[in-house]
A protein has these predicted regions:
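Boundary/entry segment of secreted carbohydrate-active catalytic domains
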Residues: 1-26, 34, 45-47
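Aromatic-rich peripheral "rim/lid" segments of glycoside hydrolase catalytic domains that contact
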Residues: 59-66, 302-380
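Structural preference for beta-strand elements that scaffold enzyme active sites
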Residues: 2-6, 41-43, 95-99, 139-145, ...
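Active-site groove signature of glycoside hydrolases
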Residues: 99-112, 126-171
Length: 380
C-alpha cells in the first residue's frame, strides 16, 4: 500500500541558482537535505523547449524577475545536457522521484515562442523524454506537467487563447482544452506509461466539474490563501504600482502583512480551509487525484527585513492538515519555499519532518490507484 508523497518545488532554481551561496551549487548536499526533511520528490523545470532545440548548447537565460528568489535575478548561462541527467541520477541514488514541468523560461532568442501549436509542444517533450529514456532513468520520473499554470502569459506567452485576454486560470476555454488534449495525446503515444497533466492555479475550480479532463492522470492545482477571494489579502496589504513581482511589493508586505494577517487571523485561516475543501470536492467529481506543489499561505515571500516566517509556517501547516483530511491528495508540498535558498524556512528541519510525516499518514485517493500515477509513485 502506498501513501501520499511529500513533494517540493525546485522549479528552474535547480540549475539557475548554482553560484556560491545560491542554494543549488552542490546538488548532493541539497538532495540530502530533501531526504532529511522527509520529502519523497522534487518538481523541476526540464526546459524541454531548449533541450529539444540543442541539448548541449549553452543557453543565455533572461531573468523573469529581480525581486523573487526563484531562479536567477540576473541573466545566467546554463547547459542543460548532461546536467539534467546528472541531476536525475543523483535523485535516483536517493530514491527521490522527479516531477517534470516547465515554466518555459525566456532565452536570448526566445525559443519558446515556437510552441504555438500542440504539435510543437508535444515534440519538445518527446525529444526531452527520449534523452531521459536513453539514459535509463524513466523510473525516476513521477509525472509530466507539460506547462506550469497554463495558460498564464508569464509561462505560456506562445499560446493565444480565444478570446486572447483569457490567460491566467483560463484553461477551460475550447482553445486551451484542444491544445492540452492534443499535446498530451501525442506525448502519450510515445511514452504511454507516464502520468500527464497541465498545472493550473486560480479559484475557478468548478471547471473541474464542468470540463472533461479525462485525458489527465492527475490535477496539479496551486492554491494560496493570499490569492483567494479575488486576492483579498494582497488588496488589503496594498498593490504595488509596478506589479506584484517587484521590490515595492515586498516593501508593502514588510510594512503591512503582519498587521493585515493578525487583524483577522481566523478569517484568513478559514478562507484557506474553505478553498482547499472546495478544490478537493471539485477534483473528486472530476475523478482526478490532486497534486499541489505551490501552496498554501502566501505566494511570494523570501528572507527579508521585517518578514518573519512564523505566520507563513502556521498557515502552511494548516493547509497540509486540511488537505490531508480531505483524502484527495496524492502529492503534496508544504509551501512554495521548501528549498535551500529560503534559509528561514529550510533550516527548520523539525517543521518539515512534522509536515511530511503528516502527509505520509494521510489516505491516498482511490483515483490514484486507477491511473499510471499510482505506479509512478512506487519504486520497483
Amino acid at each position: 500500500m502506498i501513501h501520499p508523497l511529500a513533494i517540493t518545488m525546485w522549479d528552474f532554481s535547480w540549475i539557475e541558482r548554482r553560484w556560491d551561496g545560491a542554494g543549488f551549487e552542490d546538488w548532493n548536499a541539497a538532495l540530502d537535505g530533501v531526504k532529511e526533511r522527509g520529502y519523497d520528490a522534487v518538481r523541476i523545470d526540464a526546459f524541454p523547449h531548449l533541450l529539444s532545440q540543442a541539448p548541449e548548447k549553452e543557453w543565455l537565460l533572461l531573468p523573469v524577475w529581480y525581486s523573487n528568489d526563484w531562479g536567477s535575478p540576473y541573466k545566467v548561462r546554463v547547459r542543460l545536457f548532461p546536467a539534467l541527467i546528472d541531476f536525475l541520477k543523483a535523485c535516483r541514488a536517493r530514491r527521490i522521484k522527479v516531477a517534470l514541468s516547465s515554466w518555459f523560461r525566456e532565452d536570448a532568442d526566445n525559443v519558446r515562442m515556437a510552441l504555438s501549436t500542440p504539435q510543437a509542444m508535444a515534440k519538445c517533450w518527446i525529444d526531452s523524454l527520449r534523452l531521459i529514456a536513453d539514459a535509463g532513468l524513466m523510473d525516476t520520473i513521477l509525472y509530466v506537467d507539460l506547462c506550469n499554470e497554463f495558460p498564464g502569459d508569464f509561462w505560456a506567452p506562445y499560446f493565444r487563447n480565444d478570446p486572447p485576454w483569457m490567460t491566467w486560470s483560463c484553461w477551460h476555454t475550447d482553445a486551451a482544452m484542444d491544445y492540452m488534449r492534443t499535446a498530451i495525446a501525442l506525448v502519450r503515444q510515445e511514452y504511454p506509461d507516464l502520468p500527464y497533466c497541465f498545472s493550473f492555479d486560480g479559484e475557478n475550480t468548478h471547471f473541474y466539474r464542468e470540463r472533461d479532463l479525462s485525458f489527465f492522470d492527475l490535477a496539479e492545482h496551486h492554491i494560496w490563501m493570499t490569492k483567494l477571494n479575488k486576492q483579498q489579502f494582497y488588496h488589503e496589504v496594498g498593490q504595488a504600482k509596478d506589479g506584484r513581482f517587484t521590490e515595492e511589493a515586498y516593501h508593502l508586505l514588510a510594512d503591512h502583512a503582519l498587521d493585515v494577517y493578525h487583524g483577522k487571523e481566523k478569517y484568513w485561516k478559514q478562507l484557506l480551509v474553505d478553498g482547499i475543501q472546495t478544490l478537493a470536492a471539485d477534483a473528486k467529481v472530476a475523478g482526478l487525484p490532486l497534486a499541489t506543489t505551490e501552496c498554501w499561505g502566501i505566494t511570494d515571500y523570501k528572507d527579508f527585513p521585517m518578514l518573519p516566517w512564523g505566520w507563513v509556517k502556521d498557515l502552511c501547516a494548516l493547509g497540509v492538515e486540511t488537505a490531508c483530511q480531505t483524502g484527495q491528495w496524492a502529492l503534496m508540498a508544504t509551501s512554495n519555499f521548501a528549498a535551500p535558498q529560503f534559509c528561514g524556512m529550510w533550516r527548520d528541519v523539525a517543521w518539515h519532518q512534522r509536515l511530511t510525516a503528516m502527509i505520509h499518514k494521510a489516505t491516498l485517493p482511490p483515483e490514484a490507484e486507477k491511473t499510471s500515477l499510482g505506479r509512478a509513485m512506487r519504486w520497483e
